[in-house]
């Protein structure tokens, strides 16, 4: 392939890493805003989500142009197609961070939202995201598979959070709205974990030409999409 094509691949790689870093920062700030009831920070996170949307469009445009101009095959083609998929998935991670802030901004509850499990989930998700991008950059199949498998732990953490909040609702039903908001925030983090796991699967495909468990992932994401739609309707 021409040198220009290799330069485009490198540009796309750098763009994806930058996008992932912004998604991690948005997730960090979203949870911080939520637990501290910092509405100004929440507004900033919501505003910056547009930047992530634009980055996705930029990456997709570069990849499509490269495919049209150079007609790559095999590994090069898989890399460009994977980049398009990853950028789309990162955009959804950014959306979920924004939606956590939306919960706060639409709420009239001023209670204490601080929850250690929520913080642990956030830290774990950001670690998953960082590992996914290391796997992408270094073409580390083993690490990409680890990212895929890490999602189970995040699911377990969400279950703990959910059960804890249900217990609190039973004990103190007057705080139903507050505890429900914490559940929704945790669900958006858990949803992002599923998305990052699917990024791990895509990286394995880029490296080997094979998916990990394609049908399982697609079915899980479909279920999560239905749940997310219901949550969004409640929060609208």
Swiss-Prot record:
The record's subcellular location field reads:
Cytoplasm
Give the record's keywords alphabetically: Cytoplasm, Phosphate transport, Transport
SUPFAM superfamilies referenced in this protein's UniProt entry, alphabetically: PhoU-like
**What Pfam families does the record tag this protein with?**
PhoU
Asked whether the UniProt record includes Transport among its keywords, one would answer yes
Gene Ontology MF annotations = protein homodimerization activity
* GO cellular component terms listed in the entry, alphabetical order: cytoplasm
Classify the source by domain of life: Archaea
Q: Which GO terms describe its biological process?
A: intracellular phosphate ion homeostasis; negative regulation of phosphate metabolic process; negative regulation of phosphate transmembrane transport; phosphate ion transport
Query: Which pairs of positions does the record mark as disulfide bonds?
Result: none
Q: Does the keyword Transport apply?
A: yes
- Assembly, per entry: Homodimer.
Q: What family classification does the UniProt entry report for this protein?
A: Belongs to the PhoU family.
State the protein's purpose: Plays a role in the regulation of phosphate uptake.
Q: What name does UniProt use for this protein?
A: Phosphate-specific transport system accessory protein PhoU homolog
Query: What is the originating organism of this protein?
Result: Methanocaldococcus jannaschii (strain ATCC 43067 / DSM 2661 / JAL-1 / JCM 10045 / NBRC 100440)
List the taxonomic lineage: Archaea, Methanobacteriati, Methanobacteriota, Methanomada group, Methanococci
């Amino acid at each position: 392939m021409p040198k220009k094509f290799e330069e485009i691949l490198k540009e796309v790689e750098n763009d994806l890493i930058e996008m992932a870093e912004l998604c991690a920062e948005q997730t960090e700030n979203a949870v911080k805003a939520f637990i501290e009831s910092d509405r100004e920070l929440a507004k900033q996170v919501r505003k910056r989500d547009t930047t992530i949307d634009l980055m996705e469009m930029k990456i997709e445009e570069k990849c499509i142009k490269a495919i049209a101009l150079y007609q790559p095959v095999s590994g090069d083609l898989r890399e460009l197609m994977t980049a398009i998929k990853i950028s789309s998935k990162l955009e959804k991670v950014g959306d979920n961070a924004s939606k956590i802030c939306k919960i706060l901004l639409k709420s009239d509850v001023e209670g204490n939202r601080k929850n250690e499990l929520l913080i642990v989930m956030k830290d774990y998700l950001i670690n998953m995201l960082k590992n996914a991008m290391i796997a992408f950059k270094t073409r580390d199949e083993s690490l990409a598979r680890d990212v895929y498998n890490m999602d189970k732990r995040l699911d377990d953490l969400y279950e703990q959070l959910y059960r804890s909040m249900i217990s609190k609702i039973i004990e103190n039903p007057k705080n139903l709205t507050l505890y429900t908001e914490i559940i929704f925030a945790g669900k958006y983090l858990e949803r992002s974990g599923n998305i990052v796991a699917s990024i791990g699967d895509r990286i394995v495909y880029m490296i080997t030409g094979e998916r990990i468990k394609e049908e399982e992932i697609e079915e899980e994401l479909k279920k999560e999409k239905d749940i997310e739609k219901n949550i969004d309707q409640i929060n609208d």
